[in-house]
From Swiss-Prot:
Gene3D superfamilies: 3.30.160.20, 3.30.70.1660, 6.10.140.1950. Residues 280-305 are annotated as: Disordered. This is Peptide chain release factor 1. Keywords: Cytoplasm, Methylation, Protein biosynthesis. Belongs to the prokaryotic/mitochondrial release factor family. The keyword Cytoplasm applies. The modification N5-methylglutamine is found at residue 235. GO terms for cellular component: cytoplasm. It is found in: Cytoplasm. Peptide chain release factor 1 directs the termination of translation in response to the peptide chain termination codons UAG and UAA. One of its GO terms (molecular function) is translation release factor activity, codon specific. Transmembrane segments: none annotated.
């Protein structure tokens, strides 16, 4: 193992001892935010430190067995022990290298998931509704909380645009590769001739911003408009100006929220979405600069990229980034996304490992 990697692992082992001591103090829960940060850090370090302990044990086993080589009666046994221990060390080192890959600081965050109907008119809006159901069912399987923040329903059902907040540990880490263009090929319910139509939606996955640390919004940069919330077809659902539209003047970003009867709560939610969009914008600009140096297949998150095709007549979903086709469209549309999301995460890790190899 490289000296730099050994040094890093020793530091992490020492840090784990420090965290254990801090968590064992009587006043450990006096500051709940700090307590949560420590427990999260401990959960991240624990598997690394456990694997490192196993690697060191295997190294000790090699040393012990080598001392037996001089004994003719024990030589064959010692050689077998050395071979087995070195194989364990090789396996553990590869796993440790994976565990030490740079972590995305947003991985633990809640997310705002935005789905917009694109080309295809009413069929695209219906597909936006299908995508929302797919992600909602997946969230339910993870025992996450789902909140609709903003919705613009279409006349025939589905959504022109919908934003939901998904609350749960690791929400961003699981769904961050869903940003991009989603294309559907199927016979629309409104199609009398039975012809297959192609339409598309755009999905954006944005980590929830920390209001204190991530994004500071100057009130002078905002224009705040209030208006009456309306339902499908333009009917008014209440008689007060409870709906809120925020315009961020420097960037031109606009957020509307009208799902709550309280203007105050609608404004709070709109501010949360705006902060997430601003954070997302900053990070995508940074990623674009990085991508100019090294093109990432999985993690570009470019909204214009067509990432996936849902072909209903053939019963398949194809993710174009990793050339993966799964012939179980009904299960996938019902939220059974584990295999697909796992394959994307594995490919991303492979890219990271390859990049580390290039740097070495």
């Amino acid at each position: 193992m490289k000296p730099s990697m050994l040094s890093k692992l020793d530091q992490l082992a020492e840090r784990t001892v420090e965290i254990n001591a801090l968590l064992a103090r009587e006043d450990a829960t006096a500051n709940l935010d700090q307590y949560r940060k420590l427990t999260r850090e401990h959960a991240e370090l624990e598997p690394v430190v456990a694997q490192y302990a196993a690697w060191k044990q295997a190294e000790d086993d090699v040393t012990t067995a080598q001392e037996l080589l001089a004994d003719p009666d024990m030589k064959a046994f010692a050689e077998d022990e050395i071979r087995a221990a070195r194989e364990r060390m090789t396996t553990l080192e590869a796993e440790l290298q994976r565990l030490l890959l740079p972590k995305d600081p947003n991985d633990h965050r809640n997310i705002f998931l935005e789905i917009r109907a694109g080309t295809g008119g009413d069929e695209s809006a219906l597909f936006a509704g299908d995508l929302l159901r797919m992600y909602t069912r997946y969230a339910e399987r993870q025992r996450w909380q789902v909140e609709i923040v903003s919705e613009s329903a279409s006349d025939l059902g589905g959504y022109k645009e919908v934003i939901v907040r998904l609350v749960g540990e690791g929400a961003y880490s699981r769904l961050k590769f869903e940003s991009g263009g989603h294309r559907v090929q199927r016979v629309p319910a409104t199609e009398a001739q039975g012809r297959i139509h192609t339409s598309a939606c755009t999905v954006a996955v944005m980590p929830e911003a920390d209001p204190l640390a991530d994004i500071q919004i100057n009130p002078a940069d905002l224009r705040i408009d209030t208006f009456r919330a309306s339902g499908a077809g333009g009917q008014h659902i209440n008689k007060t100006d409870s709906a809120v539209r925020l315009t961020h003047l420097p960037t031109g970003l606009v957020v509307e929220c009208q799902d709550d009867r309280s203007q105050h709560r609608n404004k709070d939610r709109a501010m949360q979405v705006l902060a997430a969009r601003l954070k997302d914008r900053q990070e995508r600009e940074a990623q674009a600069k990085e991508a100019s140096a090294r093109k990432s297949l999985i993690g570009s998150g470019d909204r214009s990229d067509r990432i996936r095709t849902y072909n209903f007549p053939q019963g398949r979903i194809t993710d174009h980034r990793i050339n993966l086709t799964l012939y179980k469209i009904d299960a996938l549309m019902d939220g059974d996304l584990g295999e697909l999301l796992g394959a994307l995460a594995a490919e991303h890790q492979a890219e990271q490992l390859a990049a580390l190899g290039e740097e070495a």
